[in-house]
Amino acid sequence: MSLNHVRVNGFGAPVLAVCGFSGSGKTTLLEAAIPMLVERGLSVAVVKHDAHGFEVDKPGKDSDRLFRAGATISLRGPQQQFERRGAGVGLSLELTLARLGRDHDLLLVEGHKDTALPKLWLDGAERSNAPEEVTGIVSTLPWNSDRLAAFMEYIERWLPAAWNARPLYGGLLLGGQGVRMGSPKQIVGFGGRALGEIVAKALGDGLEPHKTVLLGSGVLPESLASLARLADPPEFAGPGAGLIAAHRWAPEAAWIVAACDHPWVRSAHIEWLAAQRRPGRWAVIPKQRDGHPCPMLALYEPQALEAMERLACADPAHNARAAVLLDIPRTLILQPPDELADGWKNVNTPEELRNEEERLGLVVKPADK
């Protein structure tokens, strides 16, 4: 089975269609596979094509009466939520997938064989080969075969590659007024270089220089003036506002973000974070040596940033506090390897910074008189 179609198709999550003629067993296959995918920690959405139309409500119920009166209906219950739209306000397949991709790990499409989506084709008992006009078939599952095993084997090989094929950017979180440090952290010097310059170099070396973006406002070292820059959304406050700006700018991308107060971060730390990407893992937040999580030098998938914006909106002050990042679903908090652990050490006062410089011999102490 080929993996040549590894891409996201603009929907924020990997998409795979399961196609075949009526009676080929598409629903039976998905019904058996979905519990296995969920057991692996994946959030799965299915978009089903029904060419004959369907009824999903009971005639005479309040919701059905309001729908037939011309309204779009949204029903909310303790265990499920449902939306019913009429023909005039229905969503396209593309928009439906884009919306579902915000909070799911895998999007499966049953049917829609005439689309450009990558497809698994299911042979039927009497009709097997797909019509010539059906494109994007990546594999065919014969009728008399263990199709569930073949489907799961394909997903296990394809999904990690598709997940990691989504763009990965580096975001340098700029400091505010620099109350504790005396100046904004990005321009504070450490060993003859600005902290912002040190962290930006780590991001650029660990990813690609053109994928490093400045997040936030404030003065800059001259060496960073050429980097792309995103302003914080005016309706949000707090250090997470920069992540919201990043997600709105590139909603399909994952981000490794780094604050300017990590003087020990290097490309190896960024590469280690990037290597932690897994389907179903929305965020990776490393621990410092003392066990405290460090959300300001971490990895966030687009689903995580979508969830973070919802959490920040729930705050009366729209404060995107760093602690909000710890509440993102499907977040892995883990201890980095010992040889990398110092990368998550941060400095918050001029005294801490000078002590680190002196410890490493980066400054010359005046001679005693």
Q: How would you describe each model-predicted region?
A:
Residues 28, 296-297, 322, 343-344:
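Glycine/small-residue-rich pyrophosphate-binding loop that anchors the diphosphate of NDP-sugar donors
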Residues 106-163:
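Phosphate/Mg2+-binding loops and adjacent switch elements
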Residues 85-115:
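Phosphate-binding/switch loop-helix module in NTP-utilizing enzymes
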Residues 144-167, 331, 342-368:
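Charged phosphate-binding loop/patch that engages nucleotide di/tri-phosphates or the phosphate backbone
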Residues 34-91:
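N-terminal phosphate/diphosphate-binding loop that engages ATP/GTP or pyrophosphate donors
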Residues 2-52, 166-171:
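Walker A (P-loop) phosphate-binding motif
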Residues 46-48, 75-77, 137, 213-216, ...:
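Short internal beta-strands
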Residues 37, 51, 61, 67-70, ...:
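Nucleotide and nucleotide-moiety/phosphate-recognizing core
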